[in-house]
A protein has these predicted regions:
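ATP-dependent carboxylate activation and anion-phosphoryl transfer catalytic cores
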Residues: 2-17, 22-26, 46, 292-384
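Phosphate-binding site of ATP-dependent enzymes
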Residues: 215-303, 324-331
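ATP-binding N-terminal substructure of ATP-dependent carboxylate-amine bond-forming enzymes
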Residues: 1-149, 153-159, 163-166, 177-188, ...
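ATP-grasp fold ATP-binding core
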Residues: 164-165, 193-212, 235-244, 248
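A glycine- and small-aliphatic-rich helix-loop capping segment at beta-alpha/alpha-beta transitions
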Residues: 134-143, 219, 224, 353-356
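Hydrophobic beta-strand scaffold residues
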Residues: 51, 142-143, 171, 201, ...
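Glycine-rich phosphate-binding loop of ATP-grasp-fold ATP-dependent ligases
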Residues: 33, 171-176, 200-228, 247-249
Length: 384
């Protein structure tokens, strides 16, 4: 680990690029973030990059991890955790510092740890939603992934779907229910759902991923319980029509000229592609890579993935999820601006099937982040 000396700036032994992997977070996807970070840390080129790991606890505190390979030493995804023994740090919003302030035991800034680039491996609110991206913009630190706007609309499924719909991109029908209205007029909300849809429907928090808080409602009597489950995670909930069909995913990479990978297919063995199926049950789903699609449908998936990516102002990376109905309609379900990066995650596996290894993918993401950062740096911010 880089030596920390109060009152001074830490020195690095080499001219390597200092990359901070930021992981954990306050959301319900904390452990998933750690699993993704573990794979990224292992694959980063240590000959070119000095890897710094900062973990955000569920309480929101940031800790520099004394051993950047600490996550690698944990094998059980159910119990993976951060090392709380490292010093607390905060990211300075001062653009002259562009780094981490290391705090002493009295929570007083002790020293500065400058950063060249941050990889926010944060899934869900307080990380994937534009909040951390905004802080990094203030700090003038390059970072991987979408900017503030793309991250925010990519997190909020309501805003995302309205933008896609307005752009003419086909999506499943949906409606939004707010907690304040549900608490006053639950029956009226239920009536509105069943006037619009027939069972089954999916009920999901508007601002969460990894299938957390999502329920498949097969009967009308199950709706209240599903709504209460979703409201535990968000004050805004989506009710979406149930689509019978195949689940197709496509990875997108790039800034101004994004490119799409070969599509893949998820064949869940659970009722749907749940949190357990994604991360805890090794037999939870089969991944078909590449998906068994016609050439025409493959090209349609790739074109629509890029169109959705551009519509939602994404940069760097994104994974677009689709439904392919039995009558051949292709519908965009959502986009993930910080997709899963575990060794079994679809995003890196699709690029691997398209000829880009995990390590090469990380190198390309770093290049794209530096490209975006340089472009923003050159923008004028005052009248002259």
């Amino acid at each position: 680990m880089t030596n920390v000396i109060c009152g001074g700036k830490p020195e690095t032994a080499t001219n390597k690029r200092r990359v901070c992997v930021l992981c954990g977070g306050r959301s319900g996807e904390h452990e998933i973030s750690l699993l993704s970070a573990r794979a990224i840390i292992e694959a980063l080129d240590r000959a070119r990059n000095e890897v710094i790991v900062v973990g955000i606890g569920k309480d929101g505190q940031w800790h520099l991890q004394p051993d950047p390979d600490y996550l690698q030493k944990q094998s059980d995804p159910r119990t993976i955790h951060l090392d709380p023994s490292g010093p607390r740090v905060v990211l300075s919003a001062d653009p002259e510092m562009h780094g981490l302030l290391i705090l002493d035991d009295n929570a007083t800034a002790c020293s500065l740890l400058p950063l060249d680039l941050v990889f926010p491996v944060l899934h869900g609110p307080y990380g994937e939603d534009g909040t951390v991206q905004g802080l990094l913009e203030l700090s003038r630190i390059a970072y991987i992934g979408a900017g503030v706007l793309g991250s925010a609309v990519g997190m909020d499924k309501d805003a995302m779907k309205r933008l896609l719909r307005d752009a003419g991109i086909p999506i499943p029908d949906f409606l939004v229910v707010y907690q304040r209205k549900w608490s006053r007029e639950a029956q009226k909300c239920q009536d509105a759902v069943w006037e619009r849809f027939a069972p089954p429907v999916f009920v999901k928090p508007a601002n969460l991923g990894s299938s957390l808080g999502i329920s498949k409602v097969k009967t009308k009597s199950d709706l209240p319980r599903a709504m209460e489950t979703a409201f535990q995670y968000d004050t805004k909930v989506l009710v979406e029509e149930g689509i019978e069909g195949r689940e197709i995913e496509c990875s997108v990479l790039g800034n101004d000229e994004p490119v799409a990978s070969a599509p893949g297919e998820i064949v869940p063995r659970h009722e749907f592609y749940s949190y357990e199926a994604k991360y805890l049950d090794e037999q939870g789903a089969a991944l078909e890579i590449p998906a068994k699609l016609s050439e025409e449908m493959t090209e349609q998936v790739r074109q629509l993935a890029v169109a959705a990516y551009r519509t939602l102002c994404c940069e760097g990376m994104g994974r677009v999820d689709f439904f392919l109905t039995r009558d051949g309609r292709l519908l965009v379900g959502e986009i993930n601006t910080i997709p899963g990066f575990t060794k079994i995650s679809m995003y890196p596996k699709l690029w691997e099937a398209s000829g880009l290894s995990f390590a090469e993918l990380l190198d390309r993401l770093i290049e794209l982040a530096l490209e975006c950062h340089e472009r923003r740096r050159r923008l004028k911010i005052e009248h002259s």
